[in-house]
A protein has these predicted regions:
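Conserved AMP-binding/adenylate-forming
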Residues: 1-41
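Conserved adenylate-forming
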Residues: 1-2, 105-118, 122-164, 176, ...
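Conserved AMP-binding
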Residues: 11-14, 35, 157, 166-171
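Adenylate-forming
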Residues: 12, 57-66, 84-85, 167, ...
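Short hydrophobic alpha-helices that are characteristic scaffold elements of the AMP-binding
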Residues: 22-27, 49, 171, 182-183
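Structural core segment of the AMP-binding/adenylate-forming
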Residues: 26-103, 206-209, 216
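Conserved small/polar residues in nucleotide/adenosyl-binding loops
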Residues: 125, 239-241
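Conserved AMP-binding/adenylation subdomain of ANL enzymes
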Residues: 143-162, 172-211, 221, 226-227
Length: 241
């Protein structure tokens, strides 16, 4: 891989996705987050249009990718973000295990000096007309947005907060939370593929002492429905939604 190359992700909110966010962008590559809710032909289009060389994906999405991988002509490897024992069965030769790739790397890495105007991440719209449109974010714009989200009249995230980011990391970079929380020193609780599941959200809020969360109204309706049906309560730690 060379500086400026595109590295795509097709994943939920989890720690391996966070590692890929930072590992790719801070190495000089462009992290391209793919929305799995797009139609398969749209995913093929944006992978080819972005010229993604590698795609990092959660095992959940392998059935989707296996059906379209042959049409993604520029992809050199599909990295499944799991351990060897949880790898899906496939006959494709260019499928790699994330944890094996990580284990094979040296612990010593010299981070490059990057131009602040260079591209950091890439998102595609899901607009109503034509194919999705790509939007590049620079390192500078990402840093400025991160600072802006931390001010009191915005997210006001601090080192004492525990953030549960439910908005997907493939949706405008989870509204900047993957960058803002580490800068502030806030703890992040990652819901994985259960980000819309009421019982899981209630358990995470109570067990981890979540103080802040970000998500669309549908998610909160799912949580509210679960609480009403089960009689369960969430702790008063959650003060900012």
């Amino acid at each position: 891989l060379q500086s400026g190359d595109r590295v795509a992700t097709l994943a939920w909110n989890d720690y391996r996705h966070m590692e890929t966010y930072y590992g790719s962008a801070c190495s000089g590559f462009v992290c391209h987050t793919i929305n799995p809710r797009l139609f398969p032909e749209q995913i093929v289009y944006i992978i080819n249009h972005a010229e993604d060389r590698y795609v990092f994906l959660d095992p959940d999405f392998w059935p989707l990718i296996e059906g379209i991988a042959g049409e993604c002509t520029g992809v050199e490897g599909w990295v499944i973000m799991t351990t060897r024992e949880h790898m899906p069965e496939t006959d494709r030769a260019n499928v790699l295990c994330y944890e094996e790739v990580m284990a094979a790397q040296s612990a010593d890495f010299e981070w490059p000096e990057l131009d602040e105007q260079a591209a950091c991440s890439l998102c595609y719209t899901s607009g109503p007309t034509g194919n999705p449109k790509g939007v590049l974010y620079s390192h500078r714009s990402t840093v400025l947005h991160t600072y802006a989200t931390l001010i009191p009249d915005a997210m006001n995230i601090s080192s004492g907060d525990v953030m549960l980011p439910i908005v997907p990391m493939f949706h405008v970079n989870a509204w900047g939370n993957p960058y803002a929380c580490p800068v502030a020193g806030a703890k992040m609780v990652m819901p994985g593929n259960k980000m819309g599941d009421g019982p899981t959200l209630a358990a995470l809020i109570n067990e981890e002492g979540v103080t802040m969360s970000a998500g669309v109204p549908t998610v909160w309706l799912n949580l509210l429905s679960h609480l009403r049906e089960s009689g369960e309560r969430v702790e008063l730690s959650l003060i900012h939604i």
